[in-house]
Curated annotation (Swiss-Prot):
The gene is accD. PROSITE patterns: COA_CT_NTER. It comes from the Bacteria. Zn(2+) binds at C29, C32, C48, C51. Belongs to the AccD/PCCB family. GO terms for molecular function: acetyl-CoA carboxylase activity; ATP binding; carboxyl- or carbamoyltransferase activity; zinc ion binding. It comes from Hydrogenovibrio crunogenus (strain DSM 25203 / XCL-2) (Thiomicrospira crunogena). It is found in: Cytoplasm. This is Acetyl-coenzyme A carboxylase carboxyl transferase subunit beta.
Length: 284
């Protein structure tokens, strides 16, 4: 028997063990490239336990973690997208919607809830980036306006977590109209002297960054979030120059006065509760 035949059984055993490892058990950090136990990363709110890199967090998971346990209640869940333009690119818009709904379990890219943070009542919304890149369409705009109205009715702050590539191409002008619609709604919130806190997460781009996302009484970002209008590659190709290191990242924007603060994901609930109480002049 040759040496290769002697070690062949052990090679087969290792291969069989690898086959028995369930899919999705492990993941890799895109920053430090550490191999991580998936359940541990989920418990840590998609923050790498090795290098503290903030990975993308789903909209529903974000809101459920943000609110005090058991206080979050979804609102406007009945609003669903329609294909008013009968739009078709590579595939029909209806097909894209159905595929995104099946993949994410969400009806559209924006989720709104009422709840409490550290005992303080708030209305909050969050984007699901996995739903067509968190794109802003007519459903998002309608749910945003309803969230504003809910905050006015309850006399409480509005907090929105943005994670979007921008306006939804398949809805054309209906999508672009949401930039004006959401911005106008914030005017009503401001007239009622209620705070709007905008939390910019990775990525916040396009029509979302060019409208309500930058209109917060405080504009707060997570660490290393990509924030801007056009992407850095598009800008480099247009101006034909190399962009500065960290351009469009939250630290760069804070240094240049475009945002107010950077807050670690684990501290958002405590910090925002404190900020909202101060703005509302309420004691803990």
């Amino acid at each position: 028997m040759s040496w290769f035949e002697k070690i062949l059984p052990s090679i087969k055993q290792v291969t069989e063990r690898k086959k028995n490892v369930p899919e999705g058990l492990w993941t890799k950090c895109p920053k430090c490239e550490s191999t991580l136990y998936r359940a541990e990363v989920r418990r840590n709110l998609e923050v790498c336990p090795k290098c503290d890199h903030h990975m993308r967090l789903g909209g529903r998971d974000r809101l459920e973690a943000f609110f005090d346990e058991g206080t979050g209640v979804e609102i406007s869940a009945e609003v669903t997208p329609v294909d008013a333009l009968k739009f078709k690119d590579i595939k029909p818009y209806k097909t894209r919607i159905a595929q995104a709904q099946k993949a994410t379990g969400e009806k559209d890219s924006f989720i709104t809830m009422t709840g409490k943070i550290q005992g303080l009542e708030v209305v909050a919304g969050a984007f699901e980036f996995k739903f067509m890149g968190g794109s802003m369409g007519s459903v998002m705009g309608e749910k945003f306006v309803r969230a504003v109205n809910e905050a006015i009715e309850r006399r409480c702050p509005l907090i929105v977590f943005s994670a979007s590539g921008g306006a939804r191409m398949q809805e054309a002008l209906f999508s672009l109209m949401q930039m004006a619609k959401t911005s106008a709604a914030l005017g009503h919130l401001r007239a009622n002297k209620l705070p709007f806190i905008s939390v910019l997460t990775d990525p916040t781009m396009g029509g979302v960054s060019a409208s309500f996302a930058m209109l917060g009484d405080l504009n707060i970002a997570e660490p290393k979030a990509l924030i801007g209008f056009a992407g850095p590659r598009v800008i480099e190709q247009t101006v034909r120059e190399k962009l500065p290191e960290g351009f469009q990242r939250s630290e760069f924007l804070l240094e240049h006065g475009a945002i107010d603060r950077i807050i670690h994901r684990h501290n958002l609930s405590d910090e925002l509760a404190s900020i909202c109480r101060m703005l509302l002049q309420k004691s803990a």
